[in-house]
């Protein structure tokens, strides 16, 4: 059992499942900061993100750069709500390295939302124009084809959010 009281909150869900909304709610807790992948990617690579390959490359660069800092923040006792999609086994393995490296607790918030609901939210989000990225339904389908829900074998502390 860890003596570190910090918690790393992770979010898993398809595009427009409500991850960022949940992240904002979780981020209101005392001694908690939010780290948003979309903000970092849009700031660091604004002209480079046009495909899944571009996203994977840029996200991997960001993860390599930011991991040591996140571990130190967690070791310092601050909780982090990580607004990076925990949507593949490999990504969740990277996230496991963060909380294990920091010796802190974790929660994997899994948002189980149908494709139809996500696409309706996506259309609304795109129309609102307030999100860092506009995602087409075709892009949604491509990203969703790589989505892998968390499994018991991964041994995460999963909190299920059904919508």
Model region roles, listed by residue range:
Residues 59-63, 67, 112, 137-144:
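Amphipathic alpha-helical transducer elements in NTP-driven molecular machines
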Residues 38-40, 85, 114:
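Anionic group-transfer/hydrolysis microenvironments
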Residues 28, 97-100, 127:
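Glycine-rich, phosphate-binding/catalytic loops in enzymes
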Residues 2-8, 12, 17, 25, ...:
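Conserved GTP-binding G-domain of TRAFAC-class P-loop NTPases and closely related GTPase folds
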Residues 82-83, 109-112, 160:
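Conserved beta-strand segments of the P-loop GTPase G domain that flank and frequently precede/overlap
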Residues 57-106:
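Glycine-rich phosphate-binding loop used to anchor ATP phosphates in small-molecule kinases
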Residues 17-78, 124:
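Conserved substrate/cofactor phosphate-moiety recognition/catalytic segment
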Residues 102-122:
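Conserved phosphate-donor/acceptor-positioning beta-strand/loop module used by diverse small-molecule
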């Amino acid at each position: 059992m860890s003596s570190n009281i910090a918690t790393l909150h992770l979010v898993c869900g398809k595009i427009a499942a409500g991850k960022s909304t949940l992240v904002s709610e979780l981020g209101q807790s005392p001694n908690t900061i939010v780290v948003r992948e979309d903000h970092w990617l849009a700031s660091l690579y604004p002209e480079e993100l046009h495909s899944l390959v571009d996203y994977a490359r840029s996200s991997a660069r960001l993860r390599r750069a930011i991991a040591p800092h996140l571990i130190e923040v967690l070791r310092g006792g601050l909780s982090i709500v990580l607004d990076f999609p925990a949507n593949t086994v490999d990504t969740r393995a990277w996230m496991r390295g963060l909380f294990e490296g920091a010796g802190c607790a974790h929660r994997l918030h899994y948002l189980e939302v149908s494709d139809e609901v996500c696409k309706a939210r996506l259309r609304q989000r795109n129309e609102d124009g307030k999100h860092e990225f506009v995602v087409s339904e075709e892009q949604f389908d491509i990203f969703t084809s790589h989505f892998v829900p968390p499994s018991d074998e991964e041994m995460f502390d999963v909190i299920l959010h059904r919508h």
